[in-house]
Amino acid sequence: MDTTVKIDARDVNFWYGDFHALKGISMEIEEKSVVAFIGPSGCGKSTFLRLFNRMNDLIPATRLTGEIRIDGENIYDKGVQVDELRKNVGMVFQRPNPFPKSIFENVAYGLRVNGVKDNAFIRQRVEETLKGAALWDEVKDKLKESAFALSGGQQQRLCIARAMAVSPSVLLMDEPASALDPISTAKVEELIHELKERYTIVIVTHNMQQAARVSDKTAFFYMGQMVEFGDTKKIFTNPEKEATQNYITGRFG
């Protein structure tokens, strides 16, 4: 089967001030696959994830060396428009963060900000993305109600729909289910399975069972280094590195 490299990171180093947070990381992520980043707190996995849509640009005194290419383009080149990059690379955060707007306007927000004025198109896109986020049947009769009236799990699926509305090709998820109950978590995981038919998904998770359930490949990070990266089944059943084995068996973390 032909596979296309969607994200190509080459010898990435990253600093917060003098702190060397990521050390020499190289990785290829295939199109329409799910890759999970695991590792103990502070190991660099969320920092690396946020480099893919330049979220770390918002933090002062940071520095990056190496290259990150998406669809062959170095996203840190001077000519790259960060707004366009973030349309293509959507982000879903740890805690649901709906805007203080209606359910409908939460999803429509990105379209309006990007200058879409065709209300019929906006209505169609809102319906499509709410269906895509497995939320439409639950909210179709209350689109004008506040997003804050939704449960935590529904709010997180709304945030996924909001990220999808501007037609990205990559979805980044930073601990997307850590604040949710088990039933809501299962719905988000089921959704991730469905979404990979259309998107490349990179997920950071502390939940190793979740990584094993949803991802095709897993990367284990420790102290700013990527210790091991490979097929998820192999990482969890027969890792090559002792540190990976120790982490997944709970000897540290």
UniProtKB/Swiss-Prot annotation:
InterPro entries: AAA+_ATPase, ABC_transporter-like_ATP-bd, ABC_transporter-like_CS, P-loop_NTPase, PstB-like. GO terms for cellular component: plasma membrane. Coiled coil: none annotated. It catalyses: phosphate(out) + ATP + H2O = ADP + 2 phosphate(in) + H(+). Keywords: ATP-binding, Cell inner membrane, Cell membrane, Membrane, Nucleotide-binding, Phosphate transport, Translocase, Transport. The complex is composed of two ATP-binding proteins (PstB), two transmembrane proteins (PstC and PstA) and a solute-binding protein (PstS). Belongs to the ABC transporter superfamily. Phosphate importer (TC 3.A.1.7) family. Part of the ABC transporter complex PstSACB involved in phosphate import. Responsible for energy coupling to the transport system. This is Phosphate import ATP-binding protein PstB. It comes from Bacteroides fragilis (strain ATCC 25285 / DSM 2151 / CCUG 4856 / JCM 11019 / LMG 10263 / NCTC 9343 / Onslow / VPI 2553 / EN-2).
